[in-house]
Amino acid sequence: MKLDVIGIGNLNYDIIFTLERFPEFHEKINARGAHFGLGGAAANTISWLAHFGLKTGYIGAVGNDDVGEMHIKYFQGIGVDTGGIDVVEEPSGVAVAMVAGDDKRIVKYPGANLRRRFKPEYASRAKFLHLSSNPPELIEEAVNFASQRGIKVSLDIGEAPLPRELESKVDYLMMNEDEYRRKYGSLDPSLCRAKNLVVTLNGGGALVREGDNVFEVRGLSAKVVDSTGAGDSFDAGVIYGVLNGWSLLDSAKLGMLLAYLTVQKVGARSAIVPLEEVKRIAREVGLDLPFNRT
């Protein structure tokens, strides 16, 4: 079966503590709240897209443990093809986050994620590959494969290195402002060789380059409870839009809406809702998107 999108990335178990303040050295404090849930950047993105009715799959690795079983059952429950997920003899990955106001500290145990490998035969079923939180060698293999096969690829690069010759093969490069400035020395979008570029800005909003055309997308004002997964939700909006033939500008607007929903709840996937609900919220906040145009 042909799939619309295959995600490639980590599969983690997220533990999020909300705090009044961070503990001092050797101090023990009580958390104000605790959230436990499934995570992993590309997995969060794919979860949105599956809820939107796209045919999705995933390449990753989990442990032969309860957490690994939870990941597979969750994906199967929302219609994500799990044929690209390996079950290995390593504990599943875990991420622990402490959130105090606008500040956040994260500790990760990669575990089974380190055993993830690219699967060309499985990936060939996709119209579109989305990569996030991957090692450089897997990024290179996947991007080259997609380029040779005519498969569109989006890459949320994070801090991973990206050779210039590989960069030009990426259809949609996604970064935040800090990552972009560290890599290119300024916010000039012309410095990037990717075919299209989306940079989320520190003050909210995003800078979008579609071919040679550059736009700025305004963010939506929200009371931030927890920013975990907001970037992953943004990526989902961009991917959904471009797969449906939208401009990158409109696609980024949808990404902003999904990020807006995400930051108002604790946990990366707590805000996921069906597409019809997203359409309703878009109308409610006055966001003009193609699926609401008559």
Swiss-Prot record:
Catalyses: alpha-D-ribose 1-phosphate + ADP = alpha-D-ribose 1,5-bisphosphate + AMP + H(+)
EC numbers for this chain: 2.7.1.212
Binding sites annotated in the UniProt record for ADP: T200, L201, N202, G203, G204, G205
- Write out the catalytic residues in the record: D232 (proton acceptor)
pH dependence as annotated: High levels of activity within a broad pH range of 5.0-8.0.
Name a biological process GO annotation: phosphate-containing compound metabolic process
**Any keyword Kinase?**
yes
| Cofactor(s) of this protein | Mg(2+); Ca(2+)
How many cofactors are bound and how?
A: Can use Mg(2+) and Ca(2+) with equal efficiency in vitro, and to a lesser extent, Co(2+).
InterPro entries assigned to the protein according to its UniProt record, in alphabetical order = ADP-R1P_Kinase (IPR053612), Carboh/pur_kinase_PfkB_CS (IPR002173), PfkB_dom (IPR011611), Ribo/fructo_kinase (IPR002139), Ribokinase-like (IPR029056)
Activity as a function of temperature: Optimum temperature is 85 degrees Celsius.
* GO MF annotations, alphabetized: ATP binding; kinase activity
Gene knockout outcome: Disruption of the gene abolishes the generation of ribose 1,5-bisphosphate.
What NCBIfam families does this protein map onto?
R1P_kin_Thcocales
State what this protein does.
Answer: Involved in nucleoside degradation. Catalyzes the ADP-dependent phosphorylation of ribose 1-phosphate (R1P) to ribose 1,5-bisphosphate (R15P). Can also act on deoxyribose 1-phosphate (dR1P), but is most active with R1P. ADP is the most preferred phosphate donor, followed by GDP and UDP.
What PANTHER family has UniProt attached to this entry? RIBOKINASE, SUGAR KINASE
* Protein name from the UniProt record: ADP-dependent ribose-1-phosphate kinase
Q: What is the lineage of its organism?
A: Archaea, Methanobacteriati, Methanobacteriota, Thermococci, Thermococcales
